[in-house]
C-alpha cells in the first residue's frame, strides 16, 4: 500500500511453460478480475551466430517459447476480459534488434519480430473495442541477461530505471510504437541502404 491508495501485489510464475502461463493467467483473473494493463516483458536472449547453431535448434525453440508463445498465450488468456470491459492496453516489450537486424541474435530477434507482427495484427483487430497495443523496441538494458557478453560493457545501454520510464510512457500515452533514435536510424538505414547496413552491423 502507498499514500495514494495503490497496492502492489507480486506473484511468481514460470512463463517459459504453457502450464506456468495458464496458472499465472488464472491467478490474475481470480485474484484481480483480469487486467487493465498487461506488460509482456519476460524473455530470454541468446547471442550465437547461425553457423554455431546448426546443432542447437533447441535454442530457437526455447527462445520462441518464452519470448513469443509465452507472451501470446498470456495476452490471449486475458483479452476476453478486456474485450468484455471494452478497455485494456497490452504493451509488448520488443527489441531494438528487430529494427537493426542484429547479427548473432537470430533466435532472439526472430522471436521478438514475431511478437511485433502479431501485435500489429491485434491492434487492427481490436481497434474498435477500446483495446490498445503498444510495441516498445527496447534498447540494451543493464540487467543480468546481458552481463555474460563482455562486449556490452562498451556499448550504450539504458539503466533499468530508464527502461521503466519508457514503459510508463507507453502506458500513459498509448502510442503504437516506442523506439529510440538509434533504433529508428537502424530501421531507416536497412530500408534505404540494406547492403551498407549489413556491412556496418
Regions found by a protein language model. Give the residues of each.
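A glycine-rich helix->loop->beta "capping" turn
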Residues: 3-7, 27-40, 46
